[in-house]
Amino acid sequence: MTRTHLRLFAASAALILGSAVAAGAGQEALPSAWTDQTVVVDGLSKDWQGIPLTDWKKDGVSYAFRNDGETLYALLVIKDPKYRSTIEATGVTLYFDAKGAKSKDYGILFKKVRLDPEAYIAHLEKQGPVSEEDKAELRKKAGFYLYHHQVLDHKGKPVEAVSEALARPAVFKYAPDGPAAVYEFSVPLLRGSDLAAGVGAGPGAPVAVGFEWGGQTEEMKKAAAKKQREQANFANEEADRGGDPQIVRSTGTGPTPKKYSFWTSLALAKSGS
């Protein structure tokens, strides 16, 4: 190839690549709906009437967003029970990336947890003093369910919680809606630090949002590892007795629950939009 042809080829390749990048960058983001109304996070989809749902899995999983000047509200509707996987045990993680790179460097895990009375009292004391009389009444209960959130670092590990008196907490609730399960989330737009819950982008700004749930829980992983060790030991014993160790090893540990994850590019609404 001559030098002239080489330059023409390189220029054409650069033009094609530039067009592809421009097309990718120009992909239309999903618009969040602006709201001036006070939103009650209760897991009820009726509060979202008039706001269109976007399908991730047709007839399976849908989602929607709206925001005011301080808060992003997200709705996740799992219509087909097969997509729930182990969501009750794993909870739902929302990832936010204001750079649009779909990075999992920052996430918030939302999960319903059961606390014994002492753990629940400790949780309440993070928000303010609890009288001895109230503690005595709480200790009479068997336990408490808490719709809990934890900020996760780039390794997916919980960070040290910021006092709720110093930062607005994220909130979520979920409820059945016929055969579907409805998850509703509220996250402050402002993120004071990577220890606090927040989207990290303001009204009118773009942000990539990721949803993730399901898969193996830590208990499942430990149980599977234990079963594999037991099978390996039994197979070795079977081999020592002159039997066929493959009979033991072929039993397996059963199917692994699926983990579901997807991202969307979101354009936060601003007043008057």
Predicted region positions:
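Structural preference for beta-rich elements and adjacent junctions enriched in aromatics
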Residues: 24-273
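Bacterial N-terminal signal peptides that target proteins for export
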Residues: 1-11
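Bacterial N-terminal signal peptides
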Residues: 9-20
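Serine/threonine-rich, low-complexity intrinsically disordered segments
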Residues: 4-6, 18, 253, 266
